[in-house]
């Protein structure tokens, strides 16, 4: 009986690994957009944290350089938070039956 349980666990782990790989591939295709300055600065990135685009409204180019840098950083951080939230949401279905501690993040 122990042998059967072990084989079942191994099969379940292998299936989860395959599902995890598929989910990571899907996350690489999902894009989120972070914004700052009421949308004057936008950063588009995938849920794998690959930046695709940075958009800066032309009206900001003549303004203070420090302010523009702060807005770019804020938009980037907003995009990272959205990517993390989306990733956690998508992964939660895969880990719902596992006894993982609260706040445990996947993929590793």
UniProtKB/Swiss-Prot annotation:
**One of the record's GO molecular function terms:** DNA binding
Q: Where is this region: Disordered?
A: 85-108
Q: What protein does this entry describe?
A: Nucleoid-associated protein Bcen2424_1826
The answer to keyword Cytoplasm applying to this record is: yes
Query: What keywords does the record list, in alphabetical order?
Result: Cytoplasm, DNA-binding
Biased amino acid composition, Polar residues? 85-95
List the subcellular locations. Answer: Cytoplasm, Nucleoid
Q: Which organism is it from?
A: Burkholderia cenocepacia (strain HI2424)
Transmembrane feature ranges: none
């Amino acid at each position: 009986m122990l042998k059967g349980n072990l084989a079942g666990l191994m099969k379940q782990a292998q299936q989860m690994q395959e599902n995890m790989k598929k989910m990571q591939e899907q996350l690489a295709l999902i894009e989120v957009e972070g914004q700052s300055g009421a949308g004057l600065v936008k950063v588009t990135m995938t849920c794998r944290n690959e930046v695709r685009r940075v958009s800066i409204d032309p009206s900001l180019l003549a303004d203070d350089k420090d302010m523009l840098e702060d807005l770019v950083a804020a938009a980037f951080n907003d995009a990272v938070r959205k990517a993390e939230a989306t990733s956690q949401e998508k992964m939660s279905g895969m880990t719902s039956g596992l006894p993982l501690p609260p706040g445990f993040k996947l993929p590793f």
